[in-house]
Regions:
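Hydrophobic anchor residue at the start of the ABC signature
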Residues: 105
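Conserved ABC ATPase "signature" region
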Residues: 72-87
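Conserved ABC ATPase signature
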Residues: 91-95, 99
Length: 218
């Protein structure tokens, strides 16, 4: 994964997408293959689901303060995501879906990451909410130059917003530029051929930079 690159991982449920992300952040063992990561790389992670005990008194502000490795640049980026929103004093369990995703994104940015991992980060959001969230992601990518590695079931987003697509089904079925993957037999076997009419939720310009993470058979 190169700086500034947007790579999207697709595949059916149970294909290993979330497990791959957990392996990257070190919370799941690697069954085979290896992940090669630069020793200095910083990773931010937005999980698919945040499991919080609803009886636990935890405000959004307190939740953000629990991050230990934050830095000044990360704090600035997190503040830009949150803006002047007044829900920081709200209990995490009471936040709307869109508010929670902003808080999770802000938390992932506190260490000013080189690579941002998004595990179905717009799950549960409606189309306007998803579009607003992806716009924030693009703003972060443009301002920081970080790479974005995301899992998504929204094939419109995948085909319009990614520099590269990796299709998993227990192994790498196919990978490459979006249109190349969309026309591959392996992809069509999984998702069908109805990929016309995709739309861009945001625009992006990819700049080639030094690779930060290499993935090999994991």
């Amino acid at each position: 994964v190169s700086s500034g690159e947007i790579v999207t991982i697709v595949g059916p449920n149970g294909s290993g997408k979330t497990t791959l992300f957990k392996a990257i952040i070190g919370s799941a063992p690697i069954a085979s293959g290896k992940i090669i990561m630069s020793p200095s790389v910083k990773v931010g992670y937005v999980p698919q689901v945040l499991n919080v005990d609803r009886s636990l008194p935890l405000t959004a502000e307190r939740f953000l303060s629990l991050v230990n490795n934050r830095n000044d640049q990360g704090l600035l980026r997190a503040q830009q995501i949150l803006g002047s929103e007044d829900y920081l004093s709200t209990q995490i369990s009471s936040l709307s879906g869109g508010q929670l995703q902003r808080v999770l994104l802000a938390r992932a940015l506190l260490n000013d990451p080189d690579v941002l991992l998004l595990d179905e980060a717009t799950r549960g959001l409606d189309q306007p909410g998803s579009a607003a969230f992806y716009k924030k992601i693009e703003e972060v990518r443009e301002s920081s130059g970080c790479a974005v590695l995301m899992i998504s079931h929204d094939l419109h987003v995948v085909m319009s917003a990614s520099n590269r697509v990796i299709c998993l089904n227990g192994h790498i079925c196919c990978q490459g530029e979006p249109q190349s993957v969309a026309s591959s037999p392996e992809y069509r076997d999984l998702f069908g051929s109805n990929i016309d009419g995709t739309f861009a939720l945001y625009q992006h310009n990819h700049k080639e930079n030094k690779s930060r993470i290499n993935h090999s058979n994991a």
